[in-house]
Amino acid sequence: MANTVHLSSSSLFIQTRGRKYNSILSFNNLQKRTVLSLSCALTSQGGKDMIPPKGKSNDRNFAFDFKSYMIRKAESVSMALNVSVPPQDPLAIQEAVRYSLLAGGKRVRPLLCIAACELVGGDEATAMSAACAVEMIHTSSLIHDDLPCMDDADLRRGKPTNHKVFGEHMAVLAGDALLALAFEHMTVVSSGLVAPERMIRSVTELAKAIGTKGLVAGQVSDLCSQGLNPYDVGLERLEFIHLHKTAALLEAAAVLGAIIGGGTEEEIQKLRKYGRCIGLLFQVVDDIIDVTESTEELGKTAGKDVMARKLTYPRLIGLERSREVAEKLRREAAEQLLGFDSNKVAPLVALASYIACRHN
């Protein structure tokens, strides 16, 4: 029986390297195996104990099984995503969409959305359409980010990137399709489950998180900073990039869950700050592992940020200080959870620790 969480942060890597899935049928088979691979990875690998940090929001007699929780949520999200993009005409675009959307991954953003919803009194069913919408947008951003005109990446989640399989033209359209589908899915599927005023607020939050006040702003700043002397750019600009390019969508995932779950304004704002902290934490750790892990371990090309002379935390302040920043952000995230029910908040406490300790 699992009393504490022993989760190697590399354990969520789904082994699909070296394979191409050019049909709906073959990718459906992959989808079925992904859940099994995720389960095996989480239950077979050891790692650093991830017990929620002690504090007012934690019961010392309660140990949360994060492995089982993450497996359950990943299974639920993957099944919901599979249903959301059925094979239909035109098959060419559907195959490209499904290839990236159903490629596994850690499902951190939908998990965060569901956990936030459950924390404030909602349930998984109510949060699922928003959780799927966030993952669709995240996948859209990855497809576009990997394009030759952006990061020019060959691998994503251990597989050839979307444009390597389907061509640049189809990859652009797949990303566009997912962006539109996210809002359609969230509003149509949630109809009758979420009060209209809360849905309108949720749509506004999500749109803001991915536009010129969020993800796009971060991407533009990142592109404009490439090749510059990091000391001329500075830490403030680096934080702006990461808060917008990465943290904005994670923050939105938490906020959407809290809004849809019926949270109070105080609860929504606490979870907003939590999401922002773990969002920045996610990117700081991503910067660290880009220079400390191999391509095989990452499931994507290692060292690309260095080769592109991108502005990163290790490049600006070094590895040790970057690790200190990561730990500080983990603590700040945990502080936002004080005052919530200790059992209900356990997934979010464990999630912050998982992000801080991950290797891919």
UniProtKB/Swiss-Prot annotation:
Residues that hold Mg(2+) 1 according to the record: D145, D151
Transit peptide location: 1-39
Pathway terms, separated by semicolons: Isoprenoid biosynthesis; farnesyl diphosphate biosynthesis; farnesyl diphosphate from geranyl diphosphate and isopentenyl diphosphate: step 1/1; Isoprenoid biosynthesis; geranyl diphosphate biosynthesis; geranyl diphosphate from dimethylallyl diphosphate and isopentenyl diphosphate: step 1/1; Isoprenoid biosynthesis; geranylgeranyl diphosphate biosynthesis; geranylgeranyl diphosphate from farnesyl diphosphate and isopentenyl diphosphate: step 1/1
Gene Ontology annotations for the cellular component aspect, listed alphabetically: chloroplast; plastoglobule
CDD domains per record: Trans_IPPS_HT
UniProt-recorded Gene Ontology molecular function terms: (2E,6E)-farnesyl diphosphate synthase activity; dimethylallyltranstransferase activity; geranylfarnesyl diphosphate synthase activity; geranylgeranyl diphosphate synthase activity; metal ion binding
GO process terms (BP): carotenoid biosynthetic process; farnesyl diphosphate biosynthetic process; geranyl diphosphate biosynthetic process; geranylgeranyl diphosphate biosynthetic process
Pfam families from the UniProt entry: polyprenyl_synt
PROSITE patterns the UniProt entry points to: POLYPRENYL_SYNTHASE_1, POLYPRENYL_SYNTHASE_2
Annotated positions binding isopentenyl diphosphate: K106, R109, H138, R157
Cofactor: how bound: Binds 2 Mg(2+) ions per subunit.
Keywords associated with the record: Carotenoid biosynthesis, Chloroplast, Isoprene biosynthesis, Magnesium, Metal-binding, Plastid, Transferase, Transit peptide
Compartments where located: Plastid, Chloroplast
Cofactor(s) essential for the protein: Mg(2+)
Binding site for dimethylallyl diphosphate: R156, K245, T246, Q283, K300, K310
Enzyme class: transferase
E.C. designation(s): 2.5.1.-, 2.5.1.1, 2.5.1.29, 2.5.1.10
Function: Catalyzes the trans-addition of the three molecules of IPP onto DMAPP to form geranylgeranyl pyrophosphate.
Complex formation: Monomer.
Family: Belongs to the FPP/GGPP synthase family.
PANTHER family per UniProt: FARNESYL DIPHOSPHATE SYNTHASE, GERANYLGERANYL PYROPHOSPHATE SYNTHASE 11, CHLOROPLASTIC-RELATED
Protein name: Geranylgeranyl pyrophosphate synthase 12, chloroplastic
Organism name: Arabidopsis thaliana (Mouse-ear cress)
